């Protein structure tokens, strides 16, 4: 099993330096990668077209999630769409998620939309300290 503590320390130090107390989902994936913890395929897109390209590359269905250090509860903010099955749905979903996020928190810093391979089974894990 991988154990890259230096990478994890850099990630956590950068989060702390920015004044945050939680990781974004992509930062969490980097931590998982550093420790060899398998996670679904994913990427972050800043445009609807880029999101559709990511989704096509990993295969449908996918999950779309807002990426913002200011929105911790993505589902509550309308920032999650599951079972997205086509490029057209990805593009429409991208716009919907951004609109929902801005409505939920107008001042939120939006880093993009995470496109993630949809997998069945497993267990969602939230780690806190």
Feature names for model-found ranges:
Residues 1-129:
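ATP-dependent carboxylate/acyl-activation modules
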